[in-house]
Amino acid sequence: SVKEKLSDMKYEYEIEAEFDYIFKHSGQSHAYAPIVASGKNACTLHYSDNNQKLKKGSFVLMDIGARVSGYAADITRTYAYGEPTKRQIAVHEQVKNAHEAIIDMLAPDLGIEEYQRNVMEIMGAAVAELGLVKSPQDEKVMRYFPHAVSHGLGIDVHDALGRPRYFQPGMVLTVEPGIYIPEEAIGIRIEDDLLVTEKGHRNLSRSLSTGW
């Protein structure tokens, strides 16, 4: 896997090239322009240069998905390059815990507005736990979590879900919490692709390790 080969790579573009090879060797293609962002580059949400040298002791964020049979995947993992600091591990753990808590909520008939409120409570608590804001309700939470947690996924990477009031079986969406701390050069996001089922949900990308 790319995670196992990461320590042998020196530049962001080498990681991108590894995915290029894997996808083309399988007769598939990228669903969108890949993001390979190390260190502070991960704080730029749609970073696309993918040309910086990897630095030991940093995290590498990889937002990459294949297009297979016309359908897109959209997956993000953030892995350590070298030995991470306690602070980096703490941020990663908060994102991982939030990711799991948000996924656990997904079920048919869950209200979209309720989902959004719960997401902000979870992310607010995570950001506050890291000492970045004074309380989970602080408006500055959005400084460290500045994007939506989910979008529809299908033929288009950002597929339209319509305007439903509740989640419904058959919907496919991403769950992608992240915490970005530019002043500490830490940007961590974990993203999976979820199918809402009759009884709950199915994680379509669960086989990929979410650990650091």
Q: What are the functions of these language-model segments?
A:
Residues S1-W212:
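Active-site neighborhoods and metal-handling regions in enzymes and metal-associated proteins
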